[in-house]
Amino acid sequence: MKPSVVRRSDARPRPDLHAVSDAIVLRDVRRAYDGRDVVCGVSLEIRAGEIFGLLGPNAAGKTTLLSIISTRIRPTEGDAWVHGKHVVHDVNAARRLLNVAPQEEALYPTLTAEENLAFFAELYGVRRSERARRVQEALDTVGLASRKGDRVATYSGGMRRRLNLGCALVSAPRVVLLDEPTVAVDPQSRAHIFDAVRKLRAGGTTIVYTTHYLEEAEDLCDRIAIMDEGRVVACGTLAELLPLARATEVIRLRLLHPPDTLAPLEAAEGVEKVEAVGNEIRLFTTRAQLALPRVYRTIAQLGQTVLQTRVTPVTLDDVFLELTGKELRD
């Protein structure tokens, strides 16, 4: 891979030949604001027709990366292509291939859902003869067909988020970028959004889905890139990422008092790693059944009392902790 350089505006770099069939290709993408990098040399290949998750805490660089892919901002360095179209040098061609459902809603509350969708269909250049069909398809996809004649001012927050997604669909994009689509929505609307995303994937649409909810990434995404401080620290399927935690199970203990030392627990047979926050202890292991009796004996020798014990499979939060030294939920 060649290092990224700042190119002249008339240069037209191309992705590697093997990557042209991918929906999105990023090569050494960097974005800086006021001399500070918020996206730091990201390289990714996102396959056509997959749900690709960008998982990370707030300020990880997810939204900025999405803005580069969508052509809303230019990278400081590096290159990005959407189905072979460069997001800087072929910007209009790239824009025709994708659409974005941003966190910020751009809806007209005095119009009905149907009228909002029709407006965006016209804005995106959908032929008049196709608009009614596109509007109805979007309503069906996001589960709002029965409320299409109601003014948006009467919608709940979750329904508005679903309509916001629908507005991105009327142009029939090959790539849809979803930026934290379920933040502060009700469970019913979240389920509708999940259904819509799965329908789009079934129809061959590529989805890039940013979230800081690890459960969403685990349940919904085909592959996941974990981001922290502008960098991709790991990328793969859930099955590929979970082993990075160096364990298969986590013993979660709540003690009566915070421990004075973790060294005896770290030395217990079967324990790979120990993390503590206050009186909450997490012990990473591949053999919880073997490790637990030894852990209990060690805790008793320390004069501690166990108030609660849970054994759970490792999660992406545990992977994030292993890779970055902090919790995704922090």
Name each region found by the language model.
Residues S70:
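Helix-to-loop junction immediately C-terminal to a conserved catalytic motif
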Residues G78-H89, A93-A94:
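Conserved ABC transporter NBD signature motif
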Residues N99, A118, E122, S129-R147:
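Conserved ABC ATPase "signature" region
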Residues V176-D179:
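Catalytic Walker B motif of ABC-type/P-loop ATPase nucleotide-binding domains
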Residues F194-T286:
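ABC transporter nucleotide-binding domain
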